[in-house]
């Protein structure tokens, strides 16, 4: 097993999703694009691909960039639906960061003539 496969396959969100203190008291928006998300369809086992758009206004914590990359990559061998993967990412980040505002958009590549976009926005909940 290559080192990249090993670190992704052994990623534990509870201990490996590194969170840093936010050193700035002003409000600001962090935007990330994660274009290489993949997981497996829970029904067929076929791969699903998406771009994950994350934006948040931090409170006291921010997520370390390599850690969010590894977390997103840890989905690649999991059988999980579009809805469940987007909601899991949102729930984990909301719990760990406790941001003032957060929005996740999971924009899945079309498969079988269906294009799915899942959006979870704390300002609309």
Curated annotation (Swiss-Prot):
State the EC number(s): 1.7.1.13
> What does the record give as its pathway?
tRNA modification; tRNA-queuosine biosynthesis
Query: Which Pfam families would you find in this protein's record?
Result: QueF (PF14489)
Listed GO cellular component terms? cytoplasm
InterPro entries, alphabetically? GTP-CH-I_C/QueF, NADPH_dep_7-cyano-7-deazaG_red, QueF, QueF_type1
Alphabetized SUPFAM superfamilies for the sequence:
Tetrahydrobiopterin biosynthesis enzymes-like
Q: Which reaction does it catalyse?
A: 7-aminomethyl-7-carbaguanine + 2 NADP(+) = 7-cyano-7-deazaguanine + 2 NADPH + 3 H(+)
Chain positions recorded as substrate binding sites: 63-65, 82-83
Q: Which GO terms describe its biological process?
A: queuosine biosynthetic process; tRNA modification
What positions constitute the catalytic site?
41 (thioimide intermediate), 48 (proton donor)
Spell out where the chain crosses the membrane: none
HAMAP family given in the database record: QueF_type1 (MF_00818)
What family is reported? Belongs to the GTP cyclohydrolase I family. QueF type 1 subfamily.
Its protein name is: NADPH-dependent 7-cyano-7-deazaguanine reductase
Origin species, per record, is: Sulfurimonas denitrificans (strain ATCC 33889 / DSM 1251)
The gene designation is: queF
């Amino acid at each position: 097993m290559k080192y990249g496969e090993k670190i992704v396959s052994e990623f534990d969100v509870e201990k490996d999703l590194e969170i840093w203190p936010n050193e700035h008291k002003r409000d600001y928006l962090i935007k990330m694009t994660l274009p290489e998300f993949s997981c497996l369809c829970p029904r067929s086992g076929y791969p699903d691909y998406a771009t994950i758009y994350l934006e948040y206004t931090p409170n006291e914590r921010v997520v370390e960039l390599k850690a969010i990359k590894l977390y997103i990559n840890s989905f690649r061998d999991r059988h999980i639906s579009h809805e469940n993967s987007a909601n899991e990412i949102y729930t984990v980040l909301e719990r760990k960061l406790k941001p003032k505002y957060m929005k996740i958009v999971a924009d899945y590549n079309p498969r079988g003539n269906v294009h799915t976009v899942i959006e979870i926005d704390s300002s609309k909940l």
